[in-house]
Amino acid sequence: MTTWTQPDPSYTAAGQALARAARPDYFVWLEHVKAAAGCTRPIRLSGLLSTVDATTGRLLNDRHTDGLPDAAIFKACGNRRATVCPSCAQTYQRDAYQLLRAGLVGGKGVPTTVATHPAVFVTLTAPSFGTVHNRIVRKHSCADRRRCDCRAEPCHPRRDTGTCRHEQPAACWARHETGDPLLGQPLCLDCYDHTHQAVFNLFAPELWHRTKQAAERSLRKLCRRRGIPFHPAMSATGKVTYKAPVRLSPGKVAEMQRRGAVHFHAIARLDGVNPDDPADLITPPARIGIDDLIVAFAQAATDIAFTSPAHPDRREGWHIGWGEQVDIRPITMTGNDEVTDAMVAGYLAKYATKSTEATGHTSSRITADTVDDFADPAGDHIARLIDACWHLGRATHIPTPLTGRPVPYPDPGDRLTPFGTPWTCQDCGTRTRYAACPVCVAERQASLDTKPANTSKPHPYTRLRRWAHMLGFGGHFLTKARRYSTTFGALRAARIAYRRHEHNAPTHAYPQAPTSAEHLEPDTTLLIGTLTFAGVGWHTHGDALLANTAAALARARQQAGHEEIAHELGSTITGTQPVAA
């Protein structure tokens, strides 16, 4: 008869948490990891922390991270994907909201006058690559679209319920619910063009770039037709060029549909151009308005299309263009119309933490060792998309091995010496018996050594293997014009400065904790860290449990505070405004 032995408490997360909390330096450790407390996999840094006089450069103090709790400095990973780190993803999402909204109403270094500039909300979708199951609601009666329970229309009704060439049903009469796993799946996997969709995802950023350029060209031509003067500008070579009086400042985000095709939501703001200060954001001319901006983008979305480069599987390339569903709406700053600044910023920031979760596929970068786990030419929809990316991204040119190359042999009677009749080089005057002048060859080779040996551009389809885990899309989630708004780096720097200045007096100070330069007198000392990567993650599951719990409680208090402030503001506004009879 076997007896059960209770495991050591240190082997469980709860036991490790209790052991950590029982230490006398528990609150010191909790304060030390506060900056990365909510992170799932924080980065640990170790090394030397030196305090240096800023004026003389004299070393004042040296401290090693071995004297800190856990002998390391913890830094949040900063990953934007919610499936990887929910805490860092929430921070990224809030930064994205502030960045996008600042480009519409000002703030964060952007003048508030941009609120008077014309702006539109543009949605550009991918074309059809085959019939998929979808959910269409003609008229919503729900209060919240995120919890929509409205009755949907039949998926794909047809008068003649036939089959496709692969003997699959060509109609679907089901009324799909919101969480139906069939949504986004093709009616026939063999009829669906997975290859074309993978190529579209790859070239979608280039298509957006050309669409934006076409809209800008359309606005410039409109300015010429209406007689709006262009601004002369002097180039670096002394040539006078004329700049358009208007400029587009867009910001776009990418969203992955359930079928695995990427489409874009964009904010496009129209700015004027100050010839004396190109970085200045001024109001555009009055003769160019919101209607002209809508027409320019609508025309560009219709006209712009191109053919992808040739591929061995398709010499003529693939057609890259937008789908039929193009939506362009004006944005208002009053908060009373259909599309407002807060709605747009919140809608776009919602996708800040998304990747390919909508398709049901989440994975890290796929390699040759792991591709068989995800790609299958006869598998489901996502497996076929990944297989198409991997197949198209293969090496299309394999050089002949050295052992298989022909070796030229001299004919009988040929001289086997490199020397010939003496001759004089006409370029440098060198007298030589070599077939080529050694002086000129050395100079020419020296100039060639500064250039890459292979000047040919890599095949664009090779990027499909790198981004196979993203179903071919290799662009960033959020891109913007330089003058649209602030940057993520500026928002992070402001947050770090706030934490250091406002929270520089912890309740339980560690006696050997380093003090950064912002905590001292200005312009007196600097804190220089010579740090190296020590690892990723918490030391124990108990540490992760304690740190994440403390961070979750702090976020809950913060959220409750935000809701209370919003409630008080709403009550104040309601109390001051007259109620309609």
Question: Where do the protein language model's features map onto the residues?
Answer:
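A short, contiguous, amphipathic alpha-helix enriched in charged residues
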Residues: 202-245
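Histidine-centered divalent-metal-coordination microenvironment in nucleic-acid enzymes
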Residues: 85, 122, 239-276, 348
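Long, low-complexity, charged/polar intrinsically disordered accessory regions
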Residues: 1-84, 90-93, 318, 322-581
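Helical (often loop-to-helix) elements that flank the catalytic cores of nucleotide-handling enzymes
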Residues: 266-313
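Active-site-flanking beta-strand signature of metal-NTP-handling nucleotidyl enzymes
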Residues: 120-125, 187, 350
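Low-complexity, serine/threonine/proline-enriched polar segments
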Residues: 143-193, 304-315
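Long, contiguous juxta-domain segments that are non-catalytic but functionally important
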Residues: 71-117, 127-169
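Catalytic micro-motifs at enzyme active sites that drive phosphoryl/nucleotidyl and oxygen chemistry
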Residues: 70-74, 107-112, 224, 228, ...
